[in-house]
């Protein structure tokens, strides 16, 4: 995940030699049912979870049969999807209390690799009672989201009843990942884009941004929000 490198540091007046930690970046070739899809750079952890989360959240597959990781090649086998965004109508039955939102936001995130290098994003999953399920760091925010989605799927969680909290801004492609995987609630310390808000509104996704220091903004609520 990280490694030491030798650097020259300038302190505003002098240079001096020292060692510092940097993030490890690996490039992986992604295949769906043997067909090359794309190459991605990511941290070399939770690769099986990434494979499952990526294939589902990007709409390539709706059922995973097998994942093979061979060095820098990741091959995902399963049933194909038509890649259309699924309308997440079932989320109308999901309610969440403001106290649970407060609990999740107040949960202390220990992003050790980010603290050491400043080079990582993180993503986490919580249940509707505000309990933490999984936490992952990665050099890419989309990768981190895919990894926690994949973890939830592999461990038989119902994603309709999970909450995604992560560190990056919320663009529309993150909302698409939520829709394709069945997530209904996204919380981030950063804001969403206008397209993300529109897409979340259309699909009844509860979108919360600027979740920091006990404060947050609600951008879309739909039928999810319970006063």
Swiss-Prot record:
GO biological process: Mo-molybdopterin cofactor biosynthetic process
Assigned GO CC terms: cytoplasm
Listed Gene3D superfamilies: 3.10.20.10, Cytidine Deaminase, domain 2
Main location group: cytoplasm
Xref: Pfam families: FdhD-NarQ (PF02634)
One of the record's GO molecular function terms: sulfurtransferase activity
Keyword tags: Cytoplasm, Molybdenum cofactor biosynthesis
Compartments it resides in: Cytoplasm
InterPro entries: Cytidine_deaminase-like, FdhD
Binding site for Mo-bis(molybdopterin guanine dinucleotide): 210-215
Alphabetized PANTHER family for the sequence: FORMATE DEHYDROGENASE, SULFUR CARRIER PROTEIN FDHD
Similarity field: Belongs to the FdhD family.
HAMAP family registered for this protein in UniProt: FdhD
Protein's job: Required for formate dehydrogenase (FDH) activity.
Name under which the protein is recorded: Protein FdhD
Organism: Methanocaldococcus jannaschii (strain ATCC 43067 / DSM 2661 / JAL-1 / JCM 10045 / NBRC 100440)
């Amino acid at each position: 995940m990280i490694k030491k490198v030798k650097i020259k540091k300038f302190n505003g007046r002098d240079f001096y030699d020292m060692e510092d930690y940097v993030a490890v970046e690996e490039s992986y070739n992604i295949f769906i049912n043997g067909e090359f899809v794309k190459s991605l750079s990511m941290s070399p952890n939770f690769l099986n979870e990434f494979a499952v989360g990526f294939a589902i959240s990007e709409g390539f597959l709706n059922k995973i049969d097998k994942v093979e990781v061979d060095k820098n090649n990741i091959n995902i086998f399963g049933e194909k999807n038509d890649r259309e965004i699924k309308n997440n109508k079932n989320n109308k039955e999901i309610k969440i209390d403001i106290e649970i939102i407060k609990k999740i936001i107040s949960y202390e995130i220990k992003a050790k690799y980010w603290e050491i290098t400043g080079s990582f994003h993180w993503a986490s999953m919580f249940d509707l009672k505000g309990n933490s399920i999984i936490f992952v760091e990665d050099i890419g925010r989309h990768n981190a989201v895919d990894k926690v989605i994949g973890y939830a799927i592999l461990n038989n969680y119902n994603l309709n009843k999970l909450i995604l909290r992560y560190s990056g801004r919320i663009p529309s492609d993150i909302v698409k990942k939520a829709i394709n995987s069945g997530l209904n609630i996204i919380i981030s310390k950063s804001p969403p884009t206008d397209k993300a808000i529109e897409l979340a509104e259309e699909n009844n996704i509860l979108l919360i941004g600027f979740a920091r220091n006990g404060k947050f903004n609600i951008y879309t609520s739909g039928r999810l929000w319970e006063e």
